């Protein structure tokens, strides 16, 4: 069966038996298979799991990742396959750099993506440091994404399994980080990975995919209320003309484009159009008021060697992880920002989300929507 899972050498011109690979193990099936496959192919595998929170007493965190229960799963996989595994406790750093940022973003009237922030400031930054300190050659993850190196240039592509592609969540990964990163699952489909997990007799073979924000045990609103209750303040719900329609119990309860749960009866459907943290107001209106064909992005991470020309570059952009992509033109601005002109108007351009930029299936980079 292993003949169906051929991968390129992790390090060019270096045999597996001479290559040490740190594998970031979340406790899920993908990273477990990545580690097991490399071990079977003869690589010197070291499994590392970052424990980001404790879910021992909370069954609601099933479907998440990187908790104490997931650490146990990763450790069991390593033990059954016969390679070393280490757990690094990152609960404090995770709280300070991801959870606090998550709450800050919501209280600013934006909608965060903590998974990208976690990859950016913890998983890749700190795991890469651990990889270097161990003297390992590469850091391997179970992400569904493809990377090709040619003549010292790096090209990143969507996964062959388009339903599982995770390139959107990795837009903030830098070129220097990518030089040490390897993604052996990018050329395979999820169903094949589960078959391989069963072939290796991994206990996580049927473990559900992570779908939730790992540290949110119920709803994100409840999490914010528990961790920072003083930020939840009542305010007005207004229409697009400024007329007061009702009151709300905190802008963190809303996101741009939301229709359900607004709490206002109306003949025509109402959507959340704007969140104003300064006035603590929620603006609602018809769906047509959500349509936009221009947006701005900041903190751009540009992976392509070619710079964005001043007269613009025609691209495809994804404004949500589930978005199939829209044709657009990107124009560079000062201070690592850019303007995006969409070919067609798009609903729910949401501040705080990521705008990831592609040339067909090649990821060029991305930035945060202002």
From Swiss-Prot:
Principal location class: cytoplasm
Pfam families, sorted: tRNA_Me_trans, tRNA_Me_trans_C, tRNA_Me_trans_M
Region (Interaction with tRNA): 164-166
EC number in record: 2.8.1.13
GO biological process: tRNA wobble position uridine thiolation
Record's catalysed reaction(s): S-sulfanyl-L-cysteinyl-[protein] + uridine(34) in tRNA + AH2 + ATP = 2-thiouridine(34) in tRNA + L-cysteinyl-[protein] + A + AMP + diphosphate + H(+)
Keywords noted in UniProt: ATP-binding, Cytoplasm, Disulfide bond, Nucleotide-binding, RNA-binding, Transferase, tRNA processing, tRNA-binding
Active site annotation, chain numbering: 118, 214
Function: Catalyzes the 2-thiolation of uridine at the wobble position (U34) of tRNA, leading to the formation of s(2)U34.
GO terms, molecular function: ATP binding; tRNA binding; tRNA-uridine 2-sulfurtransferase activity
Name of the top EC class for this enzyme: transferase
UniProt-listed PANTHER family: MITOCHONDRIAL TRNA-SPECIFIC 2-THIOURIDYLASE 1, TRNA 5-METHYLAMINOMETHYL-2-THIOURIDYLATE -METHYLTRANSFERASE
Organism this protein belongs to: Ehrlichia ruminantium (strain Welgevonden)
Ligand binding (ATP): 24-31, 50, 142
Record-annotated disulphide pairs: 118-214
Swiss-Prot/TrEMBL site (Interaction with tRNA) positions: 143, 353
Cross-referenced InterPro entries: MnmA-like, MnmA-like_C, MnmA-like_central, MnmA-like_central_sf, Rossmann-like_a/b/a_fold
GO CC aspect terms: cytoplasm
Annotated compartments: Cytoplasm
Gene name for this UniProt entry: mnmA
Protein name: tRNA-specific 2-thiouridylase MnmA
Family affiliation: Belongs to the MnmA/TRMU family.
């Amino acid at each position: 069966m292993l003949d169906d899972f051929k991968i390129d050498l992790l390090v060019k011109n270096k045999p597996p038996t001479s290559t040490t690979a740190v594998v970031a193990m979340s406790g899920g099936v993908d990273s477990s298979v990545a580690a097991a496959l490399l071990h079977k192919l003869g690589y010197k595998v070291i499994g590392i799991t970052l424990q980001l929170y404790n879910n021992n007493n909370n069954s609601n965190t099933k479907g998440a990742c990187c908790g104490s229960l997931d650490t146990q799963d990763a450790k069991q996989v390593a033990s059954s396959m016969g390679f070393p595994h280490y757990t690094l406790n990152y609960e404090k750093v995770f709280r300070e750099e991801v959870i606090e940022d998550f709450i800050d973003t919501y209280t600013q009237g934006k909608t965060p993506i903590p998974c990208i922030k976690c990859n950016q400031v913890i998983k890749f930054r700190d795991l890469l440091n651990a990889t270097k300190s161990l003297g390992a050659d590469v850091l391997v993850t179970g992400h569904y994404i493809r990377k090709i190196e040619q003549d010292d240039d790096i090209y990143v592509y969507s996964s062959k399994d388009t339903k599982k592609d995770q390139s959107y969540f990795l837009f903030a990964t830098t070129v220097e980080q990518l030089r040490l990163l390897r993604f052996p699952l990018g050329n395979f489909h999820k169903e094949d990975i589960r078959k391989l997990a069963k072939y290796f007799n991994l206990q996580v073979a049927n473990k559900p995919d992570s779908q939730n924000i790992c540290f949110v045990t119920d709803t994100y609103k409840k999490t914010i209320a528990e961790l920072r209750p003083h930020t939840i303040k009542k305010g007005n719900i207004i229409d697009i003309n400024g007329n007061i329609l009702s009151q709300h119990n905190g802008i963190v309860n809303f996101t741009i484009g939301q229709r359900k749960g607004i709490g206002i009866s109306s003949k025509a459907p109402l959507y959340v159009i704007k969140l104003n943290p300064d006035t603590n107001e929620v603006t609602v209106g018809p769906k047509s008021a959500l349509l936009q064909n221009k947006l701005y992005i900041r903190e751009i991470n540009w992976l392509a060697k070619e710079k964005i020309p001043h007269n613009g570059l025609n691209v495809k952009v994804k404004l949500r992880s589930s978005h199939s992509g829209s044709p657009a033109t990107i124009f560079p601005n000062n201070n690592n920002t850019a303007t995006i002109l969409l070919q067609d108007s798009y609903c729910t351009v949401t501040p705080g989300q990521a705008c990831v930029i592609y040339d067909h299936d090649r990821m060029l980079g991305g930035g945060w929507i202002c």
